[in-house]
């Protein structure tokens, strides 16, 4: 009893001297424990006199006494050697300053008491020493969580820019969490190869928080993933996320599988000869499959022609799975090479009738092939297009006559020959056709005149730019030449119309 009272007196004296808030909190807690222990000891004195005190109670009190004495010794040691504490603080600060800017995995205690580790970024070192649960001096680090799941973990944007007007206590967002340096773990990089159906992930939403969800499907080519978010508060539960906004969660089973794979890798690494043998075997298999694709494959059509309907996504997926172009499917490369062709049987005919039709065609397996029918229809359409083009090329209209006969740029002999063979093809057209062509040419002339006016305005506006002036002059000359061509065509049409009017007047009596 006297020892407890002496220890309580020492604690009270230490409270009067100590100014550090953390040490004062520890001393106050120690004072409370000592007072409770004294109260229990006074209450157990009658039982001790009557020999009813159990061995377990005495052992517990002795353990608590030893623990309190060790804590008092630590406090006295800290008060007695401030220089040593300062030296220890400098050593820890030097050690942790080299970790500034590094990624790590830091603990976070939620409001309901649960403790979980999250990826974070070390951004500072605290200036005060602390005593961890093992009684070892340590320093707290200030970390910012990179995948915040709750609002108290969300970093303050204004604090990162140095413009936050609130302190750490009043700000609704995080200015960095203080965690002991000994509790820091290695950074867990996201492993996107784990992404698969029903895989648990964290997905980043517009509120900058990472919400839990489960994977529905993964596209490793475009690096996108469809996730169904947990909880009923999300209006759109199923969304598409890029890989940059996802973080695959590692479960206990995945850790076990990873540890087993690491152990197997260590076992395999001890036998380098077996690895080299496996590599040689894989290389030989690849060479054999390439040989099969070069010497045994006799294509009847262009390899991969079916990809014109799929934008090439099929070949990309097969290449990611290890497929070698030109080889068959399967591990030995002896499967089919060309895709299975679709077959459409005649409507309303039985299977026996369809088999008879195929036998009548000498057993042609592709007799009902859709691709063959499409190719046959395509060839027919191409032949029809060629015939239509030939008919259109032989047909002579007013513009063809004006371009070739009246305003052609060929030699004089060609013009003379055209004049001998076709003295005036405009006479073959009706008055209605000539009137329509006259109106069209007049519209083209007005449009061309407007274009020339715009080019001239550009020349006047950009008089100082030599390169632009040169290009505009070339464009102006081309426009004027086209205008002259149109005016010549209009003159020819007007002359033909005037000739017809004169003939009509001559025949009138």
Swiss-Prot record:
Pfam family, one: G-patch
Species annotation: Drosophila mojavensis (Fruit fly)
Lineage of producing organism: Eukaryota, Metazoa, Ecdysozoa, Arthropoda, Hexapoda
UniProt xrefs under InterPro entries: G_patch_dom, Znf_CCCH
Extent of Polar residues compositional bias: 47-58, 423-433
Name this protein carries in UniProt: Zinc finger CCCH-type with G patch domain-containing protein
GO molecular function annotations of the record: DNA-binding transcription repressor activity, RNA polymerase II-specific; RNA polymerase II cis-regulatory region sequence-specific DNA binding; zinc ion binding
Keywords from the named record: DNA-binding, Metal-binding, Nucleus, Repressor, Transcription, Transcription regulation, Zinc, Zinc-finger
Zinc finger (C3H1-type): 155-178
